[in-house]
Amino acid sequence: MLKVAIVGASGYTGIELLRLLHGHPEVSVTCVTSEQSAGKNVAEIFPTLRSRYNLVLENLEPVRIAERADFIFTALPHKAAMEVVPTFLKLGKRVVDLSADYRLHDAREYAAWYEPHMNPELLKEAIYGLPELRREKIAEADLVANPGCYPTSIILGLAPLLKKKLVNPATIIADAKSGVSGAGRSAKVDNLYCEVNDGFKAYGVGGVHRHIPEIEQELSLLAGKQLTITFTPHLVPMDRGILSTIYAEPAGEVSLAGLVELYRDFYHGEAFVRVLPENNFPSTAFVRGSNFCDIGLTVDKRTGRIVIVSAIDNLIKGASGQAIQNMNIMNGFPENLGLESLGLFP
């Protein structure tokens, strides 16, 4: 039985890790931390866990945690993770980090979008944890950087086209919409019910959203050359889910039937990517509560552009579910352990 610690367990990604790991036959959660809620039982913070967990939230003390856990999930805010991850690694623990602290390979790029990195040497060692593209490297990694939610939906949506060089990378536009849980659990005026309900707004407009360098880094690796995309995120008044609509001009003549076949071949055997039939498109309603990424696509007959639509649950395939998928790979477990739940409906 793998003993697991969740560092930063009182946020939305923390509760999702606890919920999903409860059904994992090879895992026992032995330690949970929260600086703000230390001393409280997790069921006080998340009543949904009543009678299923009897864990008390602790202060973050890496040495004590490492004594009781074999594997660490860090679900901390950006910057906070880099303060503790090196210690866990030195103590011989393997880590999946759910923050953005280790997703970028270039320390200068990280500093430009966030702030100077405290341990830039680890940026080269961390493996970007998108299992469908990095499975072999994830299996050998000590530190996996769990991808962001928007990047997951966009990279999976574009990977087959870029790998086969079927689109002009300079024409890529990604228009994505997210539920409010993507902003985290801390109290913010912009996320209050009266501020969000009955509204739909763009934010991070004009190439300033922090997920951009992560998206461009991974798409550039797929394309084999540096690329720049246009990305605009939107906030939708729903709890969870991301729907990304992606546009790109083909590099040559394409057919819809050929594109669907390409995607099915590319994702053949993948447990959590579902390619829909021609002219069928995903909905966040059908992936809610699951680790699936649903992808549909078409060719706009008027403009010739390829249109890809992808849907994920931002808290699961976009965060905690993907983190568990990475943990499974790192420990030689079947990849789908603990992640077989179908989406909630309605």
From Swiss-Prot:
Gene3D superfamilies linked: Dihydrodipicolinate Reductase, domain 2 (3.30.360.10), NAD(P)-binding Rossmann-like Domain (3.40.50.720)
Provide the function of this protein: Catalyzes the NADPH-dependent reduction of N-acetyl-5-glutamyl phosphate to yield N-acetyl-L-glutamate 5-semialdehyde.
Entry superkingdom? Bacteria
Record's catalysed reaction(s): N-acetyl-L-glutamate 5-semialdehyde + phosphate + NADP(+) = N-acetyl-L-glutamyl 5-phosphate + NADPH + H(+)
Native source species: Geotalea daltonii (strain DSM 22248 / JCM 15807 / FRC-32)
Q: Give the enzyme's EC designation.
A: 1.2.1.38
Q: What InterPro entries does the record point to?
A: AGPR_AS, AGPR_type-1, NAD(P)-bd_dom_sf, NAGSA_dehydrogenase, Semialdehyde_DH_NAD-bd
Write the signal peptide boundaries: none
Q: Which UniProt keywords apply?
A: Amino-acid biosynthesis, Arginine biosynthesis, Cytoplasm, NADP, Oxidoreductase
- Identify which residues the record assigns to the active site: C149
What Pfam families does the record point to? Answer: Semialdhyde_dh, Semialdhyde_dhC_1
Gene Ontology terms: biological process: L-arginine biosynthetic process
What family does the entry list? Belongs to the NAGSA dehydrogenase family. Type 1 subfamily.
The identity of this protein, by name, is N-acetyl-gamma-glutamyl-phosphate reductase
Q: What class of enzyme is it?
A: oxidoreductase
GO CC term (a single one): cytoplasm
Q: Where in the cell is it found?
A: Cytoplasm
Q: In which pathway does it act?
A: Amino-acid biosynthesis; L-arginine biosynthesis; N(2)-acetyl-L-ornithine from L-glutamate: step 3/4
Q: NCBIfam families of this UniProt entry?
A: argC
Q: Keyword check for Cell membrane, yes or no.
A: no
